[in-house]
């Protein structure tokens, strides 16, 4: 009985003395960044491979990231926003660079061929596998939307979307209201 009381005391103290925190601005590992910071766990693991995407003539977005990188955490809502806008029209292939360490780099149908060794890195490839956008760090979602529209041959309309935080961890893409600034 005495042992049970001591055990309960230790368990209660462990939970109160060492709370768990997640922080978008730190380089700590908090778990997978898409469900935690973008509210979209369906992006990982990728639903397709680059090879399949090119074979099916689909536009691909490659996103190379690490779960314990603050810049990658900050971009997760933007990648999730692109998924929301273009879900049925493009393939989003988000890969942690840990997965790429022992892969060969010679094949242009493989994801690692396009990774430049820095994170986060975002690329847009047309249906033929030609790189139309390649950037490390912060991305311009409007520029990516314009590129995707051009590849698809549809008119590009200036974006009326923005990515806004709805709590301290998650963000959502929402319609931009420019009337507030007038």
Positions of the model-derived regions?
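Bacterial N-terminal signal peptides
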Residues: 5-15
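N-terminal "domain-start" segment that seeds a small globular fold
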Residues: 20-49
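Soluble non-cytosolic domains of exported or imported proteins
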Residues: 44, 69-73, 119, 138-142
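N-terminal post-signal-peptidase region of extra-cytosolic proteins
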Residues: 45-49, 65, 76, 106-110
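Typically the conserved alpha-helix immediately C-terminal to a functionally engaged Cys/Sec
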Residues: 48-50, 71-86
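Short active-site neighborhood of thiol/selenol oxidoreductases, capturing the structured segment around
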Residues: 53-68
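Thioredoxin-like thiol-disulfide oxidoreductase module
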Residues: 80, 91-132, 141, 148-152
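Thiol-/selenol-based redox modules, centered on thioredoxin-like
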Residues: 137-182
């Amino acid at each position: 009985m005495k042992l049970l009381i001591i055990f309960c005391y230790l368990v209660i103290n462990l939970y109160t003395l060492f709370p768990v925190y997640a922080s978008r601005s730190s380089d700590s590992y908090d778990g997978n960044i898409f469900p935690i910071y973008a509210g979209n766990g369906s992006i990982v693991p990728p639903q397709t491979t680059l090879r399949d995407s090119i074979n099916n003539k689909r536009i691909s977005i490659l996103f190379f990231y690490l779960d314990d990188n603050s810049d990658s955490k900050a971009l997760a809502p933007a990648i999730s926003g692109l998924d929301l806008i273009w879900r049925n029209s493009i393939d989003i292939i988000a890969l942690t660079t840990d997965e790429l360490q022992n892969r060969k780099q010679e094949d242009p149908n493989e994801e690692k061929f396009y990774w430049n060794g820095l994170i986060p890195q975002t690329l847009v490839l047309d249906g033929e596998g030609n790189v139309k956008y390649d950037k490390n760090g912060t991305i311009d979602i409007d520029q990516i939307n314009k590129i995707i529209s051009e590849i698809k041959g549809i008119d590009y309309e200036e974006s009326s979307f923005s990515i806004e935080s709805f709590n301290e961890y998650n963000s959502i893409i929402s319609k931009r209201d420019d009337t507030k600034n007038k």
